Curated annotation (Swiss-Prot):
Keywords: Ribonucleoprotein, Ribosomal protein, RNA-binding, rRNA-binding
HAMAP family: Ribosomal_uL2_B (MF_01320_B)
Biased composition (Basic residues): 255-276
GO molecular function: rRNA binding; structural constituent of ribosome; transferase activity
Gene: rplB
Function: One of the primary rRNA binding proteins. Required for association of the 30S and 50S subunits to form the 70S ribosome, for tRNA binding and peptide bond formation. It has been suggested to have peptidyltransferase activity; this is somewhat controversial. Makes several contacts with the 16S rRNA in the 70S ribosome.
rRNA-binding found in the keyword field: yes
Gene Ontology, cellular component aspect: large ribosomal subunit
GO aspect biological process, one term: cytoplasmic translation
Spans annotated as Disordered: 213-276
Subunit structure: Part of the 50S ribosomal subunit. Forms a bridge to the 30S subunit in the 70S ribosome.
Name of this chain's protein: Large ribosomal subunit protein uL2
Family as reported in the entry's similarity comment: Belongs to the universal ribosomal protein uL2 family.
Composition-biased stretches (Basic and acidic residues): 230-240
């Protein structure tokens, strides 16, 4: 997918880039697969901010995505490739032979007219086909990966995301994630063959603050620009440093300090990500 630039008729657009929409088919979305979800803007049910630097952003409807891929043995044809405002990859509308329509994450190389399917085993290794991990050959690139059988995909769902199946042992398979982490996943979990499309998303330059506001991202004030009452880094004369290791507004170490809590699934991680 090509990166496009813009004429600099304002300074903010000079370095702004975007993605071309040549792969998107000009058809309206399926209304039965659209649902309205109120924007929380980072607030909880009490109206208090629980996640800072968020706002509602541009109005949008949620597209119901099939993350489980449980229509075994029923082939589906790609009807359209669509833009999804809720994620950074494209989605594909699949029209199944029994008349049902569903959206899926579009893998790279999947085009209008292609036929895909889901099964426990026995399918061709081509982008868009979904099988259980135990039935996928070692070395295959996969995405849309379940962590618990039947729960739906939780890993490798964003633009350019993937994992590589490195080996199999008893009831687990070994996956290598893009971070370099080697992890065991239950062999009964479903995964889809291929890489998530729209890989060039990582090369897009936002260019101006307004585009982040459309996405629901608010400005982030530096702690050193605040007063001591507001942040541990605040205060001082001029641009004086805080004199301590970086911390959050609540005094917890940040910028490199490990904050992940230990949990039962840690035993499934064979090796941590690169450089850790």
């Amino acid at each position: 997918m090509a990166i496009k630039s813009f004429k600099p008729y304002t300074p903010s657009r000079r370095f702004m880039t975007g993605l071309s929409s040549e792969d998107i088919t000009a058809k309206p979305s399926v209304r039965s697969l659209l649902v309205k979800i109120p924007a929380t803007a980072g607030r909880n049910h009490n109206g208090r901010i629980t996640s800072r630097h968020k706002e509602a952003g541009a109005k949008k409807l949620y597209r119901i995505i099939d993350f489980k891929r449980k229509k075994f043995g029923i082939p589906g044809k790609v009807e359209t490739i669509e833009y999804d405002p809720n994620r950074n990859c494209r989605i594909a509308l699949i029209s199944y032979s029994d008349g049902e329509k569903r959206y899926i994450i579009r893998p790279s190389g999947l085009n209008v007219g292609d036929v895909i399917s889901s099964a426990e085993s026995g399918l061709d290794i081509k982008p868009g086909n979904a099988m259980k991990l135990k039935s996928i050959p070692v070395g295959t690139i996969v995405h849309n990966i379940e962590l618990k059988p039947g729960k739906g995909a939780q890993m490798a769902r964003s633009a350019g995301g993937y994992a590589q199946l490195m080996g199999k042992e008893e009831k687990y398979v070994i996956l290598r994630l893009p971070s370099g982490e080697m992890r065991q996943v239950l062999a009964e979990c479903m995964a889809t063959v291929g890489v998530v499309g729209n890989e060039d998303w990582a090369n897009v330059t936002i260019g101006k603050a307004g585009r982040n506001r459309y996405r629901g991202i608010r400005p982030q004030t530096r702690g050193s620009a605040m007063n001591p009452v507001d942040h541990p880094h605040g205060g001082g004369e001029g641009k004086k440093n805080s004199g301590r290791h970086p911390v959050t507004p609540w005094g917890k170490p940040t910028k490199g300090a490990k904050t992940r809590r230990k949990k039962a699934s840690d035993r499934l991680i064979i090796s941590r990500r690169k450089g850790k």
